[in-house]
Amino acid sequence: MKRMADFFSYALVFCILITFSLTSVVSFAAQDEINVVLNGTKLEFDVKPYIKNGRTMVPFRGIFEALGVEVSWDGVNRSVLATNDTTQIFIEIGKDYAFVNGYRIDLDAAPEIINGRTFVPLRFVSENAGADVSWDGHTRTVYINYIDEKH
């Protein structure tokens, strides 16, 4: 009888440990996620944003389209051209600089292609399109405030 009680005690402790371990893994994964909120609405990208050299990297087409910026991809030269009424942004993959209205701007994180998807630095793109950007490190959320003057 004592052996059976010991067995159930160990089984209970084991189940509790497994439960806490799984909860910690799920919690850690959720903390690792980066959220992007534009004018109070959470943006959903088809691939997840990530951090590179302290900069949040996002899929270029998703962020430009969310900001209402026209975008084109040049596959031969591996470059992105984005334009709105006042700004033209030219970015080349792998380069640590970009051009905004013809002026060279150094980047903290170079745009890159991962699994066939092009990622660009969110703050650089958003601010140069005319948005205000802030980061909440506690919730791992980027807040973008943007007024598209065309609408």
Each predicted region: which residue ranges?
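Primary recognition of N-terminal secretory signal peptides and signal-anchoring hydrophobic helices
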Residues: M4-Y10, I16-H151
